[in-house]
Amino acid sequence: MKKMKLAAIFAGLVSVFTFSSCLNDGDSGPNYDLYEIVTVEDGSIFGGPILKGDAWGYTYTPVASSVLAGLKASDGSYYKRVQVGIKLMEGEAITEGKKSYKVSEVGLIAILNYKDFNVQADTLKNEYALVSLEDSNNKIWAINGYVNVPFTFKTKEQLNMNDFHLYAVEAKEDTLVTRLRQTKGADDAYQTGGALISFHMPFNDMEFYETFNKVVPKSDTIVVKVTAKGENDKELVSTVKCSASNMRGSY
């Protein structure tokens, strides 16, 4: 029940809040053991890519490189953020306290939008009002170096994820304050759209690194605060708690 409920939640979230998705063709395919939104990360020098899950903090290691063949883009690189179905290697079983599993099959369900935090916020020239940040069914979450933001916007033309930017503003005690900014639009826009973007924390950028280092965790927990311009001069604010070491750990 837990597995199917989570799959339904994630599937609904991806279908509603992504600009584009990629679904498997053909029959229903393998009977997967679980479904996850995952980050595809490079493994150690002795191994290939691994998957780090959002839901339970599991790490999935493929038994062969071919297992992840379906997660490759046309240029041969791996998509960084995807929703997948996972079949555990024979003999593996989800066990309380165990965080690492070997997997024999991985099926691509959807590709999430992902991009880096903007590190040149002073060059952004426009800011249009968003309708909302998150809603009762789709909340902001942060894990494995990504801040995942569902939001609703207005437009008169087709937009893509490069028309939206998340950047760090300041550190306040245990909180990293960020701002989500829509830079393409129109003040009289009337069409409403929804999106989900996974924003990657750029720890290789010195200014961001220094700002993040000023955040003071409480027992390894920090708060990421996302702000945005709302309609009628309203300030939109959403917050999420996450592990500081987990957010750093992918880099």
Segments and roles (model prediction):
Residues 75-78, 186-224, 229:
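Short, solvent-exposed, Trp/other aromatic-anchored flexible loops in extracytoplasmic proteins
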Residues 1-44:
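Bacterial Sec-dependent N-terminal signal peptides
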Residues 230-251:
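Short beta-strand elements
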Residues 70-100, 225:
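Flexible glycine-rich surface loops and low-complexity tracts that mediate binding to linear polymers
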Residues 92-154:
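Surface-exposed beta-loop interaction hotspot
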Residues 131-194:
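Short helix-loop boundary/capping segments
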Residues 54-75:
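Beta-strand/loop nucleic-acid-binding surfaces
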